[in-house]
Amino acid sequence: MATKIEQMLIEYGKNAENRKLQTYYSRKSYMEKLGIARAEEPHSAYWANLLKGDDVNCDKKESPLMWFLQVLVNRETTATAYGTTSPIPADMKISIISRTLDFQIEEIKAEKKIKEIANKYFSTNPNWSNVSEPCEDELDIYIKCAIRGVLGIEKLEIIVENKVTQKENGPKAKKNQLRPGYDDKCQTVRYYNACNSTSSSNKVQLFVLLTPDTTGIETTATDKHFIQISYQDLLDTILLPLIESDSLLDRQRFEIKDYVDVLNLPTLDIKESQRIIMAKTTEQADAIHNYVDRNRLLLCEALKAKIRKEKGMNSLTDDDLLLKFIDSNKNVLWALACSSYANLVDHIVDGKTGNIYLINDELKVYGDATFGQRFLEFFYEQNKHLLKDNLPFCDQLNDMLKQFFGTSTSWYGVKNKDPKHYNVIDKDNDLSAMFGNFGTGQNLAKLIKGLNTNSPDWFRFEKL
């Protein structure tokens, strides 16, 4: 008679949706076969070519560039340097939203030398007169268009900084800081200062940061003139509608579908830090969600078997079967680990790459930058009964955290002198203020170290 685990594995293998998902995530996109699936330059080249629209048989209203402009309008508020104003003039914005903007593409190029755009900026600065070496900085995607029909606007220039697995570059190395006030600045600050020097009253300049990250309220670029957009925005707004349209030949549709796979698949043949899913179709998001719902018990048993082996604990009868299950389904498990959908499971993240964890026998997936925030929510729920109404809320929770981690470090980034952060009636806002200091950098490293050494009964932290 089959054991419980054997029966679960039999049922797993019989399920057509499980087999379908396993087959999908065992595939390799053409970019992965070439070893460039997470390299920035090929993605920049792909989008530069697509935005030209040469392979798309449609009018300007349905062109990829028009829909790209729609994404910028939708995300313009992330460029917080403009305050309550907009980087896109009102008349132009109306034309973009109505898809009536009359533009003529003059140039779209990947890896455009910045000196070709801002030569005067580099050649006329008296502080750099003794610098003989040209600036070799490159703009990932450069777009220049002539504009007609918008009062006072004749040119549109878009500078796109594309980041796939890396963050924005900081100042150049000391030995390469030839131009004080430029080379010693972060990447987006350099690009904005140089390109903005060519601005004029009849030209609109838009600066864009493209990343796989979920777009928040404010751009993550150091220079806040950059509108932040995501690959998910481009997938939803440009690629998927194109596939369903009549604007493509079969060959072109196949090429775009293959690029969608590039975004969808976690690329297992490269180092772990680059195993990210850049964007996900609704179909795949739903498939992963349903996969976890169907197989939650089996996945938890498999993960516990893996932990027992790593810790040298006594194996159970079916552990070998469960370990073989993990090995044969590693592609699907990596897809789970790289997912960032809150409705899938609770996400707690290690900040570097996707991993699957067990917390109190519940399956958890680590894959985005909300580790600290979600831990703090959990910590608060477990300890809120200890809070006293006659004492500052943030101070109390902060003291509990310091005791938990055995450190004197303050864990929240609120202003101590601001009375509103000590209003015990305003606990939701206070808790929100504390969340902001938990997600990245040294705090995250301390948080993970603390969890590995000080886990209480209510929080068992296990890594697969």
Regions found by a protein language model. Name each.
Residues M1-L464:
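Charged, terminal alpha-helix-loop-beta segments
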